[in-house]
């Protein structure tokens, strides 16, 4: 796919992140530009192609835009912003009195997502992703990798949608419309791989990380999880039972976090104890 050429002079810098920067069009603030740092050519194209497939699969996500390149050779994606949007993490931080409602709405979105059957020929199996991460990890012994691999293989298969990075900052709403965003890790498989991320972000992450990323103290994030868990799994299940089931899946995120941080992460790795013992 050939990139559409644009001039960065037409845009205003609005923010930055680990992979690049975001801009808004000077003449229309509803038009956003996600511009990757120099050298990243394939990543924005792959992200846009996947975003298009996810959108066409019926997942509630903003419609993807154009694959673009600037005069100096930086690649990115241009798309229309959702006006008046707010993430569920920001909503909880700004309005903790309505936390139960926000948690229930987010749980409803997740239940709908995890009930959506997808064409498995178009997306990656979540198990294959974790097998690959496991093989590449330098932080586990051969015996530990064998036990983790066995656990993954024994998880029941599902052909339903997986967000892949299910943080409650990656779900937004504007009025009565709700969307998932940042679906670069979208795949299919057992829903517990997704729910494990919700638990990790709210219960296993450090308070400082939660404050910086989700704009709230850890105590509030834990409250969100508890309301979410009841709405997602049903009030007839105890929180203890739910967390025992979800904990190993949160622990599997160790493979992603340690890859990104390039060091062991004991606070998250501890969640793998049910698998490794």
What residues fall within each predicted segment?
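Inter-domain helical "communication" segments and dimerization helices
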Residues: 88-103, 107-111, 115-131, 135, ...
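Catalytic activation segment of kinase domains across protein kinase-like and atypical kinase folds
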Residues: 171-195
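An alpha-helical support segment within catalytic cores of ATP-dependent transferases
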Residues: 1-4, 115-164, 168-169, 174-175
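Active-site activation/catalytic loop segments of kinase-like enzymes and analogous catalytic loops
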Residues: 195-236, 249-266
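ATP-binding pocket architecture of kinase catalytic cores
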Residues: 12-14, 18-120
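Conserved N-terminal boundary motif of the eukaryotic protein kinase catalytic domain
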Residues: 5-13
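Short, glycine/acidic-enriched loop or turn micro-motifs at the edges of active sites
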Residues: 83, 166-168, 185, 197
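Regulatory N- and C-terminal appendages and interdomain linkers associated
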Residues: 1-3, 264-277
